[in-house]
Regions:
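Cationic, amphipathic, low-complexity segments that mediate targeting or membrane/lipid association
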Residues: 8-11
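A short glycine/small-residue-enriched secondary-structure motif
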Residues: 86-93, 116, 121, 148
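Short, Lys/Arg-enriched N-terminal segments with co-localized hydrophobic residues
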Residues: 16-41
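N-terminal glycine-rich anion-binding loop in soluble enzyme alpha/beta folds
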Residues: 46-106, 111
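Mixed-charge interfacial surface used for oligomerization/domain docking
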Residues: 39, 44, 52-61, 65-71, ...
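Glycine-rich phosphate- or other oxyanion-binding loops that anchor nucleotides, phosphorylated ligands
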Residues: 97-128, 132-135, 140-144, 191
Length: 333
């Protein structure tokens, strides 16, 4: 992108701030500054993620992020996770407690062909920050669609980044990458930043009822029964490979929340904004308890946000799940 400016000092200032080439001439600097601040409108690529990020819909709307809504099924009826816009999270978890059994499936490749085609027809390139390839066949269907579309649109770019994350760790990467997008960074620059930093986005979970992990095949039926009888709460995290792994078992809910708070304290990086967010599956009291313990261990923490775990992720972990998500040190597990 090239803009012309009237004075060398302003030219240098603009080049440094907005990373754009400038030529000296008589142009109103304020007008150029306004145009450059609209970076997302000037970009020749679209910024896309999916609802498995559990990104709150108000942030999606505010940032105008393109969103792929993942699907789930209840009693043969298909729904799409709309991030709580029309489908209340609390009701969803109340229904699960009452016996509702949501099941999730990957979107077919033809869905992505149709979705991406909308932008490719407009001459736009595509950057898609996808949830972890280790948790679904979804990303493989994306790559099938990409191959088909590039044969039809050989002059376009489709960059798919496997974030190796799901739920709010993915959302944190999306928010930070979208800031770069708004600054006018190229599609390659944004994709490379995510690749280089994705293992710094962490989540530490604990579930309330083991039957949901057992139903999803994460633990055996025997382990679920024994664990429930002994009030065992597994500690779950996202691994370096992008898998969901159980790394410890703690007896009692309060102790499990304290364990997570300590993991947060151990893994924060004081040199960056952690975007610390506690997510929960209709367990706000426990989320607040976790927040208070984190503040006790990390007194200088400036802000802790709260958000819901979405429908697709919640189908696997169940009501009562609580997690702390943040951007910090690289994952060790």
């Amino acid at each position: 992108m090239c803009f012309t400016l009237k004075n060398n000092t302003i030219a240098k200032k603009t080049k440094k701030k907005y990373n754009t080439f400038v030529v000296l001439t008589n142009v109103n600097y304020k007008h150029i500054k306004f145009i450059l601040k609209r970076g997302n409108q000037l970009q020749n690529y679209v910024f896309i993620t999916d609802s498995d990020s559990d990104l709150p819909y108000n942030i999606v709307d505010e940032r105008k992020i393109e969103m792929i809504y993942m699907s789930y099924n209840i009693n043969g009826e298909e729904f799409f996770d709309d991030l709580g816009r029309n489908q209340a999270h609390k009701k969803y978890y109340d229904d699960m407690r009452a016996g509702s059994v949501p099941r999730t499936t990957a979107l077919p490749s033809n869905y992505f062909v149709e979705y991406f085609s909308t932008f490719l027809k407009e001459g736009k390139d595509i950057l898609y920050l996808a949830f972890s390839s280790q948790l679904s066949a979804n990303i493989f269907n994306v790559f099938m669609a990409k191959e088909e579309l590039l044969a039809k649109y050989p002059d376009r770019k489709i960059i798919v980044v496997d974030t190796l994350s799901i739920s709010y760790p993915q959302a944190i990467l999306v928010i930070m990458a979208h800031d770069l997008y708004k600054e006018g960074k190229s599609i390659e620059e944004v994709a490379n930043w995510v690749e280089e930093n994705k293992l710094r986005s962490q989540a530490w979970f604990t579930v309330d009822d083991l039957k949901y992990l057992q139903r999803g095949g994460r633990i055996s039926a025997v382990s679920a029964v024994v664990g429930s009888l002994l009030n065992i709460k597994p500690i779950i995290t996202e691994s370096k490979e992008g898998k969901i792994v159980s790394i410890d078992k703690i007896k009692g809910r309060k102790k499990s929340l304290h364990y997570i708070a300590q993991k947060v304290a151990d893994n924060l990086d004081e040199n960056v904004d952690p975007h610390l967010t506690i997510i929960h599956a209709d367990a706000l009291d426990d989320a607040n308890m976790l927040a208070e313990k984190i503040k006790e261990l990390v007194p200088n923490i400036e802000k802790i946000e709260f958000s819901f775990i979405g429908s697709v992720i919640g189908a696997h972990c169940g009501p009562g799940t609580v997690a702390a998500c943040f951007f910090g040190k690289k994952r060790a597990n």
